[in-house]
Design a protein with these regions (language model features):
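Periplasmic c-type cytochrome electron-transfer domains
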Residues: 1-165
């Protein structure tokens, strides 16, 4: 599922909203801001859309085992029906996620939101900066950063579950 943060929305909507990037010394204010007030409704609409059915490239039995791994290890952040805590307004500092803070530094909250997982299989590379080429790399990253201590078989099961979403 694509996501429009304020940076993307302003650039894609012809610069008709407020935008700042302290690294570049840019702080643009529009009156009225034609973008910012609409982002919550746009996000709600995007989250209401059903994900396309997953590709037939996952093993259902393995994915079911992976669902159990997910429930134990991942639901702290991926909590609602779309697999994100975004609707709760939760943001995560770069050090919580093990991500480079460069992208987060461009956002208002200087933090990352939890990406929705529905339809995840259809849009690699992963993470805000595209640094994980595969779901295996995503699982390895969070196993290391969150000290999940997953076995190789649990990781494989979790990847199959993610492919099923």
């Amino acid at each position: 599922m694509s996501y429009w943060n304020a940076y993307v929305a302003v650039t894609q909507m012809h610069g008709q909203g407020d935008f700042s990037d302290p690294r570049l010394g840019i702080d643009v204010k529009h009156s009225p801001d034609l973008v910012g007030p609409r982002l919550a409704a746009l996000r709600a609409y995007q989250h209401s859309l059903p994900a396309p059915p997953p590709a037939e490239s996952f093993d259902a039995a393995t994915a079911e085992r992976g669902r159990k791994v997910f429930e134990r290890s991942c639901e702290r952040c991926h909590v609602d029906a779309s697999g994100t805590d975004n609707n709760a307004g939760a943001l995560h500092a770069p050090n919580e996620t093990g991500m480079d803070g460069a992208y987060a530094s461009r956002t208002t909250g200087k933090a990352y939101r939890t990406t929705p997982l529905r339809g995840l299989w259809q849009h690699p590379p992963y993470f805000h900066d595209g640094s994980a080429a595969t779901l295996d790399a995503v699982v390895d990253h969070y196993d290391r950063v969150q000290a999940l201590a997953l076995s190789q078989s649990q990781k494989a099961d979790l990847v199959q579950f993610l492919k099923s979403l």
